[in-house]
Amino acid sequence: MLISEGELKLVPYHEISNGQTRDGTQAFHDQEYSYLKSVDSSGDKNSPFYLNSTYIPEQQMPSELNIEQRDASGHVVSLLADEDILEGEAFAQGMGLSSSDFSIQKVGGEFRFLCKGRGHGLGFSQYGGNQLAREGKNWKEILETYFPAMEVAAYEE
């Protein structure tokens, strides 16, 4: 089990990070998730699925689309769509993007979204954890890498 302050907590996972996992307080905008720390997961950059492009026809998009704010790990926190401020994670999910760490480029009559990683980037990276295992780390060392503010404890009834 993974515990923080003597309690079981949410321990999210994702497929591939952008090279660094996200901080829980930045992603959720809530101190309740302060136990989710941003950690290096640069092995994820070796994944063949690290970069993903999605093309969306210009007619399906607002005329103006600009990234307003990113968090410390590079994920889009907010973007301006014409006159509206949109939340980055919700936008990425709604548009079918692989990650909220994306850049926007207008290419011909389309918008190109270049995404780094797959998933929300919080907690455990499946690809990164596998990389650490291949390097000889055991399960406990891997969990301690991705959840440094949490304690690995045995289950007791």
Predicted segment positions?
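Conserved, single-site charged/polar hotspot
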Residues: M1-E157
